[in-house]
Swiss-Prot record:
Source organism, top-level taxon: Eukaryota
Protein name: Uncharacterized protein C26F1.11
Biased segments, Basic and acidic residues type: 96-105
Region (Disordered): 80-105
Length: 105
């Protein structure tokens, strides 16, 4: 009867093998760090410029702000109308409608 034993693939010099692996890992890490440093530098430059020059508000930014303000105003006016107050101060019409609703059981 023949017994076959399988040996694990163990490298002759383990230190060299780990060094190789480490060097590739370090290279990858350095590459990623290099990229992040570039990004950080560009951000730093941009923030520096922002500190020096006053921020220019473009038309698009103003439009967006106005749109949000008008949307908020619309919400407020609709809520006040539901409560029985109108924009022009003519609250009679609205309150009459609500009185009728309240009277019905």
């Amino acid at each position: 009867m023949i017994i076959i034993t399988a040996k694990e693939n163990v490298p002759t010099n383990q230190k060299l093998d780990t060094c190789k692996n480490q060097s590739t890992v370090h290279q990858k890490v350095n590459k990623s760090l290099g990229n992040s440093n570039k990004v950080l530098r560009s951000n730093a430059v941009q923030s520096d410029k922002a500190n020096r020059e006053p921020r220019r508000i473009t038309k698009s930014v103003k439009k967006k702000e106005n749109n949000t303000i008008s949307a908020v105003k619309k919400v407020i006016t609709t809520e006040s109308r539901i409560e029985g107050e109108s924009k022009n101060g003519n609250s009679r019409k609205n309150t009459r409608k609500f009185e009728n609703i309240k009277k019905t059981p």
